[in-house]
């Protein structure tokens, strides 16, 4: 069975998404490109769009696209406490009919499993915790969190961002070897040095190391396109990478 291919709307860039009329306006293009689903980004909404989540959910259903919902927030705040807005974000995810809600780990200190379990059990959406580009998402804290969450039988999984290990200065293959059993969603991304940091690039511009890393992760995990989708013909570009990842 081929893995589900998801297009992350942010791959088109915030400016292009706005020019095209917002994330809802991208759905026909993404469907025509052959994708199975869309990752909706909260940071790309304006205030009015945040009030129209049910309408977005209906549009996703009409286009027969699965939904994932990404929020630019951390599960754990800087003081180590659970993000009090998590129930709100899960509710927003439910309104668009999302299968999963993606957040970053944040500053994990100690697992308050009962509090987190109460929040998760109140929702039909699966929480998937991602390694972002900050020191809080280095391999050691990610492992510690998922080991404890697994021991506590918490109903959550990991979003494995293939490119973000470069920002944290770690080896993606080593991370995959230790974290793959927790992974249920993959952000496909590769990056190259750019000044004192990195920048994401399209797969056609990268070497083949991304294939080895992808093959080290669960074969049935949905694959999200989070590298830049750019060009004069966005439909052709999107279709090219949907086909590439489906065959990889």
What is the role of each PLM region?
Residues 56-67, 119-126, 219-220, 235-248:
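Short, electropositive alpha-helical surface patch
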Residues 50-53, 80-82, 113-116, 140-142, ...:
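Short secondary-structure transition/capping segments
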